[in-house]
A protein has these predicted regions:
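A short, conserved, highly charged catalytic patch centered on acidic carboxylates
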Residues: 1-117, 127-304
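Carbohydrate-associated surface elements
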Residues: 123
Length: 304
């Protein structure tokens, strides 16, 4: 089934310009890795929707398996009210296909853990199992103890903690960014991916979550709103053609709010250029972000 992590996002913190993941239970930061993002997205679901207190969640518990010379560790264990293991979770990176081997691995771990439920997830698909004796029974629906109980409140702070919105964004920009983040990233049935980019300034904040729009066959547009290490907020849009990123633009929402003329940089095989996004694409902070995607596509095609 579609992962419950799809509409959840990990918290981030900037340390000396580096964007790091923040584990809210351990109150520590970690390197921004795909598997760790999946783990923290699931934690966000468990604590915010499923109603499981952070005090009943553990990480990296050592499991000593027969014939296993390495020290295997669990990704997540959730406990019941009596602090008995309730759920064992194995996390994979989003590009890892979950197969029988992964299920067998987590089942081996569970021989030592003894949880009645097991979950294997890559953040896109969840595979739930119920353990009855020696049987591992696949579940068609999410087990009852983990059915969402709480409504998520996605306030401005929610998006700031997850590095979608920077703390220096002007008030008019905050209203746009909060509404746009909800539109882009709150629906679990819409494709969202974390994209990484090398070789560009940290100011651009390119490495973040993008809502993916299919324009036509083999043509996609990725749209992101992301905070940078300096408290700024960027609107980043990427054109992907035939599986390759061919152009992107990045704009400061504060420059848009201040009605600065040269507010946007476009990068493509043709090089770098500066434009006024308002004039070129009819964009302003009163627009619905989804309504201007066709104009973003036209603009990037023109410059690629």
């Amino acid at each position: 089934m579609l992962s419950k992590a799809l509409s959840h996002f990990p918290q981030f913190r900037f340390r000396d310009g580096e964007k790091r993941l923040r584990n809210t239970i351990l109150k520590k930061t970690f390197v921004n890795l795909p598997e760790e993002r999946v783990r923290l997205k699931l934690i966000d679901f468990f604590t915010k929707e499923a109603g499981i207190p952070g005090s009943r969640i553990s990480f990296e518990s050592q499991v000593n398996l027969a014939g296993d010379k390495s020290k295997s560790r669990t990704d997540i264990i959730c406990y019941d009210k009596d602090f008995k293991p309730l759920l064992l979770v194995e996390c994979k990176a989003p590009d890892i296909k979950i197969d029988e081997k992964a299920a067998i691995q987590v089942a081996r771990y569970n021989q030592k853990v003894g949880a009645p439920f097991v979950l294997v997830s890559n953040g896109i698909l969840d595979f739930w199992f119920k353990i009855e004796g020696e049987q591992i029974i696949p579940q068609e629906e999410i087990p009852k103890p983990f059915i969402p109980k709480n409504e998520i409140i996605r306030s401005l702070t929610y998006w700031e903690e997850r590095a979608f919105i920077g703390h220096h964004l002007k008030p008019v920009g905050r209203a746009f960014a909060k509404t746009s983040c909800a539109s882009l990233f709150s629906d679990p049935h819409q494709p969202v991916r974390f994209l990484s980019f090398d070789g560009f300034p940290e100011e651009f904040a390119l490495g973040h979550y993008y809502r993916i729009y299919g324009i036509k066959e083999n043509v996609k547009i990725g749209v992101s709103i992301a905070a940078n290490p300096y408290g700024g907020t960027r609107l980043n849009v990427v054109l992907n053609q035939g599986g390759a990123n061919t152009a992107f633009f990045t704009t400061s929402l504060n420059l848009i709010a201040e009605q600065e003329n040269m507010n946007t940089e476009i990068h493509s095989s043709k090089g770098r250029s500066e434009i006024d996004l308002t004039n070129e694409a009819g964009f302003d902070l009163n627009k619905n972000i989804g309504d201007v995607v066709p104009e973003f596509h036209r603009l990037l095609l023109k410059h690629s």
